[in-house]
Each structure stands twice: as C-alpha cells, then as structure tokens.
Amino acid sequence: RQKKAMEMFGFPKENCFDSALELSRVPKFADAVINGTMDEQHVETSIPLLKKGYDMLLEKPFATNEKEMRELVSCVKENGNKVMISHVLRYTPFYLSIKERVASGEIGDIINIQTCEHVSYHHLSTSYVRGKWANSDVCHTSMLLAKCCHDIDLMMWMMSDTQPSMISSFGSKFQFKPENAPKEAGTKCLVDCPLVDTCRYSAKRLYLDQPKRWAFYIWDKLEGIENPTDEDRINLLKGDSNYGRCIYKCDNNVVDHQSVLVNFKNGATGTHNMVGGSAGPMRRIHIIGTKGEIYGDFEESKFTVAKIHPTKTDEKTVEVVDLNVNGDMVGAYGGHGGGDEKLAADFVEFLRGGKPSLACTSIFDSVA
C-alpha cells in the first residue's frame, strides 16, 4: 500500500513511514496529519505525533475507552495542538440543513429526538460478523461505538444547548450465532457447504457474484496481484480469509441490534435504534419541538418541516425540502452524502484559525 501511495501521489521515499512512531522520530515537515487508523489505534498513533507538534484530523471514535480518551485530551492540552474529530455526517447537506433549521428556532425547543440506523444485510455480514469490527476483543470497540457514533453525535449536536443526565441501552446478538445455522451448513462457504448457491449470506453470492461489493475489505489480501482472477478470489475465500466463513459460525461477539434511550438535563428525551440485517441501508431522524417537527430519510436526501398552525384546515404547515443528493456511500457531491469534501475544507479553515463552521468538532467539543 505504501508503494502504491508513492506511485499515485508522488511521495518521495523519505516521506514514507511504516508507523506513526517512526514518523515522529524525524523532524516535523508538515502542518498537520490525518489519522485514519483503526479505532483501537487512534490514541497510540496520535500521541507521538501530537507531541511532535502536528495538528490533526482524527477519525471517530477518537478513543475506545475513558482512560485513553482522557490521556489524549491531556496530551492535546499540554502541547497546544489543534485537533478536529471527523464527524463527517455533520457536513452532509441533509444533516447540516436540519441543524440550521433547528438552530433558527423554527420548531421551538426540542422535546424529543429519534434517530435510527438500519445496517444492510451485506454491510452487517461483511463488517460486523465476518470482518474487522466483528469481535470486540480484536477491534476493542462495540458495535454502537463503531457504527453509530455518527448517530449519537448527531443527536448530541442537535441538542447542543443541554447534556445527557441519564442513558440506558440494551441489545443482543440475535441472528448470527451457531444455533441459528441451518443443519446442513458447513464451516466454509466454498469448501464444505451445500447451501453455497442458496444461502443469502453465501460468500459466493455476496462476494464472487458481486466482486465490486466491499472489494476494499474482501480482496485486501490480493492487493499484491495486479489483475486478480476469479480463481484467485475463489482460492482466497477457500483459504484463510475471514470472509469465506459460514456467517453463523464466526467469532463475532458484538450485537446485531441495539436501542439507546437518553434523558437530557432540560427534560427532553432521545432514542436511537440500530438494527442490522435489513434489506437496505437507512438512516432516519425525527425531531419534535414545541412549535413543530422535522423528519427525514438520509438515503433519500429529503426532509419535511411541519409547523403547528391552528387556523389551517389540516392544523399545520408542511414544507418538503429535497436536497437532491444521494446517500451514504456515493453521490454527485462525493462520499458520505457530500460530507467528505466539506469536512476536508473545514479542516483547512480550522488550521488557519478561521471561524469554526456550525459542523466543526474540536476534540474539546467531543468531551464537553
């Protein structure tokens, strides 16, 4: 990967390193770094670079436990770095537009906020059953923190004038466990399973028949092959690839659905529901205020503003806002529904000392 990056972007060999620690041992030669390592590596890779004087755009969640969170915040305070957290969905036209309407007071004070995320069956099985975030002993994070820190952050952002006073949550590993496996199921889809052509979670159907789906996860071990063939892919899934395992017989220990209930200090409430294994991806939000409500679907990139109006025949005014931007992964405005590009631009402005945008999240905002 390092060699490929050198070729793509023209990096000189002396500016390529095998670790953050190795980078920290040479004289500082840039203003900032972008830390996009795995969740459990965020703190250990950030601290040497922060001590070296680099500012940073840090992927969320910026820490996976309270001890490391406090350690990182303390390091930033001691060294005076500018650290921005990559809460990219704040920058999407969908959520930013909703935040602006809420901040204007248009729907009054928020009484209740409801968010939900449905994780599609192929995303859940690839990332959270067979993949990198399937086992908390390996990735050192929970399903909620890994997948839904976006949604929890959005709830806190919309409720920025108050803080939680009490939180309760529960969930379970409902679907993907050995006792739910069909009796005929093998242990490896392409090796010993007679259901390889019919199971909806078959590695053949999910990955070989759709080789571009989640390719950056599934075929990562083939990166050294310039033009991998179908035979290369089959052999990988038959071999030691985690993605060739029976979906019901993996080492996953994270939940596949979870609900969260939040009570805020001002008396408002919030809920978040994460459900994995749905037919398609979905993120929704519904905010009810004292003057009206806002609700919408991120994937559809449209939301409705309904305001109380006693003299209207239907007792309310309704405005549908269609932003005409595709959802999470693709779109006319780039990845994450248009958020990626705006996040990068805001980070540059953040480094220059400009006025923070409504969406900007410093590390201190994240622990407030």
Q: What is each stretch, according to the model?
A:
Residues 71-88, 108-115:
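Rossmann-fold dehydrogenase core element
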Residues 1-11, 155:
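N-terminal Rossmann-like dinucleotide-binding module
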Residues 9, 254-368:
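C-terminal helical cap and adjacent loop that interface with cofactors, partners, or active-site loops
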Residues 39, 43, 68-71, 90-92, ...:
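Catalytic cores of eukaryotic secretory-pathway lumenal/extracellular enzymes that build
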Residues 89-245:
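Predominantly a Rossmann-like dinucleotide-binding segment in NAD(P)-dependent oxidoreductases
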Residues 35, 58-59, 64, 83-85, ...:
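Hydrophobic residues in well-ordered beta-strands that form the structural core
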Residues 9-75:
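Beta-loop-alpha module in the N-terminal Rossmann-like domain of NAD(P)-dependent dehydrogenases
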